[in-house]
Amino acid sequence: MRLNILSTLLLLGAIDKVVARRVLNLDSLDVSDSDSKNEKREPKRLPLDIEGIMAGHDEAMDKRDARRIGLNVDGLSDSELRLRKRDLRRPQFVLDITQGKVEERVNLDSRLAILQDISLFSEYGRDVTEVVAQWEDRSQELIVIAPTNDAISKLSMKPWQFPNNIDAMEQSNAEPKQIDDAIKENVAHFVKSHIVAHSDDFDLESDEIWLHSEADTSEKGDIVLKRQNNEYFVASASNMDFKLVKTVDVAANGVILIIDSSLITP
């Protein structure tokens, strides 16, 4: 079952209440402890039918949207009509939960380019062709977990230096092309380890959601999101060291979660 970005954030309550009211009544989501036994026994089942709720909500919104905006349905194909209505239902603002800033939404590529606190991560991302294509694609639904510049600077090795050990390759006189390819592979691995496109397989444990990054090959997932005391945290599944999400920015084709840590280290 696909858990899309909207369902993930609604389940965690990570979208600001103002936005949440425009999408779904969060009070209708029951993630109580009473479901924990069932979750352990059937880890790939949600305790409620998220997709059913969203489908019913979409149907109601479709009717209201047609009356309110006067769509020229005769001039649009079915796929174009769905995209138009979906865009209208999506959150229309970028939210900074720490400072309360509200800006008109843009695609991830444009938004990431102007967030100075994560400019290093953005630069690495722009070196990966397929990642740039995702950030520019308005049809995508991505979760980008972006380390701050300070977090990247504190790593013992630069993102392009691991997991392939570039220093060791240079000392062993590896061919220049081998080194260049290894550097590109390292950068792609670092960036993709911080991006979730969607999760076909996931486990829900209390208020924690397990997700697969684009670099993940495990069965369970390599990233964990959770809510605690009305704040949001993210961790690598390898160490479960949860870090506070400083800022949640909602873009047109995904969200950016900013943390003072890297999900992978040398």
From Swiss-Prot:
Cross-referenced SUPFAM superfamilies: FAS1 domain (SSF82153)
Swiss-Prot/TrEMBL keywords: Signal, Vacuole
Pfam family, one: Fasciclin
Signal peptide, first to last residue: 1-20
Coiled coil: none
Domain FAS1, residue spans: 105-263
Compartment(s) of residence: Vacuole
InterPro entries cross-referenced by the UniProt entry: FAS1_dom_sf, FAS1_domain, Mug57-like
UniProt entry tagged with the keyword Signal: yes
PROSITE patterns xrefs: FAS1
PANTHER family (alphabetical): FAS1 DOMAIN-CONTAINING PROTEIN YDR262W
Protein name: FAS1 domain-containing protein KLLA0E16841g
